[in-house]
Amino acid sequence: MPSGSENLPRVSFIMPTLNVEALLDNCLASIARQSYPRDRYEIILADAHSTDRTREIAKTYGAVVLDDDGKNMEEGKRLALQHATGEFIVFVDADNEITHADYIELAVKSLAANPQALGVESYYLPSPKMSSFCAYLTHLLHISDPIAWLMSANPILVARDGEIERWILPGDSLSYPLGANGFVFRRADLESVKVGEHFQDTHAALHLMRAGKREWLRVRGRGVHHYYVQTLWGFVKKRRRATVHFLQVQEETKTNWMKEKPQVPLWLAAIYCVTFVGPVWHTLRGLVRDRDARWLWHLPACLGGVLGNAWAVWTYKTRRGEKNLVAKLKPEQTLK
C-alpha cells in the first residue's frame, strides 16, 4: 500500500441510524481515535429522520447526514453507499465501538496485501460498558443469537502472518453471516456483486463467496465492542425486529445464508433451543472449557430467541402492510 497520508486509500464509514443518541457518541469517538488520517476517511450516516440528538452528535464529528426514507436499515446502507467515495467501505452500527486505534489501518493494509480475501471481519470483544448478558451474546457466541450460532459453520484458521489471520469455511458450506459490525470491504468487490441494486450486508459476503472469494481476514485481538442489547427482554424484542426484517427481505429475494449447508437445519436448531438438553450441555461445556460464568445465559437466551422469533412471525402476519414496521419495532439500546 502506498506510504504517505496523501497516498493512502480513502475509507468510507457507513452507518444507518434512528434515534441512537445513547450510543452514537461512543461509536463516533472510537472512529475519531483511529490512527488512519482524518483527511483520508469520511463518515456517512443514513438517518431515518431521528427525533433525538442523533444528527446533532453526528455533525460534531464531521459526519455527512443523509435523509433515509427507506423501509429498513439495509436500505439506509445502500443509500449511504451511493454517496460514498472511499476505496474501502467499513460498515458500522451505532452500537459498535472500535476497540483499537490501529484497527482500520491494519484492516486496509491487510486487504491490500491479500487480494484473495473478501474482507476483514471484526472480533467482538467484551467491554466494561456491557452487561454480562451482552458479553455472552457478542463475545462468546459472536453471532449474537443461539439459533444462528448453532446453524453457522465453524470457520477454520488457514494461516497467521503477524497480526493478520486468514479464515475460511469448511468444505463447501457458505453458512456463516458476514458483513456488519466493523466489517471492511473493498468498494470494487461490493460493486462486483451489484449491491447498488439491492443491498443486504450478509448477502454481499455470500455473493462474493459464491463468486470464488471464500477467504476473509481478521486482525488478531481487534474489532468492535458490540453493544447489541443489555437485557434478556431486550434480546427478545431485538430478535422480533430482526426476524420481521428477515421475513420482509425474503419477500424480495430468496438469498439466505441459513440455506447454504448449515451445521443443523433451522427446524432442528429451534427444537434444540426448547428441549433444554442441548443448551444445558453447551452451558456446561462452556463453563469447563472457558471457565466463563457468562455461559449461564445460554439456556435463557435459547428460550428468549425462540420467543422472539415466534413473536416476530405473529407480528409479520398481523402487521404485514404497516409502513415502517421494522423502524417501529426498534428496541431501546444503551450502554451499561
Locate each region found by the language model:
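Short aromatic/hydrophobic "clamp" motif used to bind/position activated sugar donors
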Residues: 89
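A short, conserved alpha-helix in the catalytic core of glycosyltransferases
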Residues: 178, 182-183, 188-189, 197-222, ...
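Conserved donor NDP-sugar-binding/catalytic core segment of glycosyltransferases
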Residues: 97, 101-146
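Short, acidic, metal-binding catalytic loop of nucleotide-sugar glycosyltransferases
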Residues: 30-40
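N-proximal low-complexity "stem/linker" segments adjacent to membrane-targeting elements
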Residues: 1-30
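A conserved acidic beta->alpha catalytic loop
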Residues: 46-55, 96-97
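Glycine-rich, basic loop-to-helix element that forms the pyrophosphate-binding segment
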Residues: 68-84, 106
